[in-house]
Amino acid sequence: MQWDVIAHGYGLVEGPTIAPDGSMLFSDVLGGGVYRLGGDGDLDTVVPKRRGVGGLAVHAQGGVVCSGRDIVHVDSYGNTRTLYHRDGIAGWNDFCTDASGRVYAGALRFAVFDPNAEAVPGELWRIDSEGSAEIVGDGVVHANGCALSPDGNTVFLSDTRSRRLIVFDIASRKRNDVDVSAYGHPDGMAIDDAGCVWLALVSGGIGRFTPDGALDRRIDVPSSITTSVCFDGNTLYATTGGHSETPELAGCVLRTQVDVTGAPVHPATI
């Protein structure tokens, strides 16, 4: 499989998201900032300096929704509005949106980059357009990648520390914890039209898992740390961390073509 490097020179790249105009948004968790890569290769800073952005979404009114210490909306003019804040949460990591524009977000209860921090489990929350929020599932040590099934009935969440892919049935609140430790540490994810999960596996490339959590195939990525993925039609993008034997592949955005199409991703309305 041929991968093309389309952006590089960052720290820990996360949150790849395709905007309505076809440009791509991504964040640098450690270096700070949210960036837009245009189809012509031009690169713009959308949100300067903001660190800890593990998830991004386009907002229905324009601008971008970012995670971090809280969840914010940065509009097209650069104005920032806090959408949701909750005391006791160290930060919000990756998130996804449903067809109504509600946000499903993983809450972190400890500083994940502090090796001495006690790994206190967090939760998966759903944030509604009125600003209310509720817990969908708990006992998630290190909430990371998050995505919804095409029918909106199931939310998938990766737990990096415990190496689990968690499958939540939204209506019943039942869950299925799938052990993916044999393949690597799970990180960001995307869903294809068949409902399969394309899961970034740190030190393990990308795995395509069926909706019930069975591994269907693996894809090699030319970097030692794969952090997240997203689709634009049958184009697959992957992001990487800041360590690689090849400097160009550290903290970069990669692109390739695959034989499936990504499921629709909805704008946020909260």
Locations of regions flagged by a protein language model:
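Short glycine/acidic-enriched loop and turn motifs that connect beta-strands
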Residues: G31-G33, V72, F110-F113, S162-R164, ...
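Sequence/structural signature of beta-propeller modules
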Residues: M1-Q2, G251-I270
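Short loop/turn segments that connect beta-strands within beta-propeller blades
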Residues: L37-G41, D75-N79, I127-G131, D169-R173, ...
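Beta-propeller domains
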Residues: L25-D44, V72
